[in-house]
Amino acid sequence: MKLKKINVRTLAVMLAVFSSVAAMGQSQQDQKSEPDWMKDFTSRITLNGYAQGGWSYQDINGKKTNAYNLKRTLLWAKARITDRWSFMFMHDFSSVVQEFYTDYRLSKGNEMTVRLGQFKHSYSMENPLSPTQLELIDVYSQAVLYMAGEGPDPLNGVNYGRDMGLEVYGDLAKGLVHYELALMSGRGINKSDNNNQKDLIAKLEVRPFDGFRIVTSGYLGTGCAVGTAAWNPDIQVGDNYKRNRYSVGAEYKTKAYSPAKYKDARPASVRAEWLGGKDGEVGSMGGYVTACIPVVDALDIVASGETFDRNTKVDGWDQTNLTIGLQYWYYKKCRLQLQYTRCLCGENISSKDYNWLQAQVQVAF
């Protein structure tokens, strides 16, 4: 009888142990089969950022000024929702929210992608490019700064070359041709449209061989003035006015930039572009040629010549800048820059030509 009780107890203990082990094994198997949501989430998010700050000296109209400056402190996150669908958000901590948009690739390849939101528009070669790659400390040429709506145009206001809208873009003929077609509000960033018209922007880029591209772009729009300009006195605040632009240019690079390490893959490059347009009845035009040549280790020589005329029918609104400088890449996407610019000005810009000395440090990841 006792032996029977012992056997029953032993059997019960063994069954409990086996069932516990089986349950643990099943639990571990279930954990392995279930996706790691946190790991999957973090693998789909990419964070990037950069800061640019430095020092500047000028003697405009004979008055010497110098100041430290923090130009940009940007952080952005890109989320890959699916293989076709992504979202991007960018904020400048020294300014305002810069970009937020979603991309959806309609084609199997790169033939067609749709973008909706607030982003850098595609007019000109320079405007869509990141300041972390561009050679000049002042980033864009005068013509691009003005014509693309970066800030110097008081009629359009400060919009950093960005706008809200819908864009379709893609590559055709195995990458030989790149196109961009956008319908934008024309008002700029973080603002609702202040007229009923929408602006059309088109760009066509041909890449006949590696490193070389020929680019043309056009802008047809209607602006609503947020300020006044001395060189365009007929347009007053609140007026709707014709705002059209065109550009044509070319660029050659000896090799492509490394996406994450500019220091390790720095091409020699030369880029030239001519831009023109009209605000109301006043025409503006200008262009630039910029070159960057690696010389030794991580040191580059930068040279640029650019000119811009705010009013082609009235003398004195033109300015030509001649720049020479050095940049040293000390880590991946981080660099030190030093540049001297001689500014040759029309009488309405400055009473005499002036000097401009700039130094800047860039930290990027």
What do these predicted ranges mean?
Residues M1-Q52, D103, F365:
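N-terminal periplasmic/intermembrane-space "pro-region" immediately following the signal or transit peptide
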Residues S192-D193, K261:
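Short histidine-centered beta-strand/loop micro-motifs
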Residues L155, K191, V237:
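Charge-dense, low-complexity intrinsically disordered segments
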Residues D59-K63, T82, M88, F100-S107, ...:
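Outer-membrane beta-barrel pore domains
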Residues F41, A67, V158, N194-N196, ...:
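A generic structural micro-feature
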Residues E34-G186, N196-I201, E205-T216, L220, ...:
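Outer membrane beta-barrel
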Residues A182-K191, V226-D234:
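Active-site-proximal beta-alpha loop/turn segments in soluble metabolic enzymes
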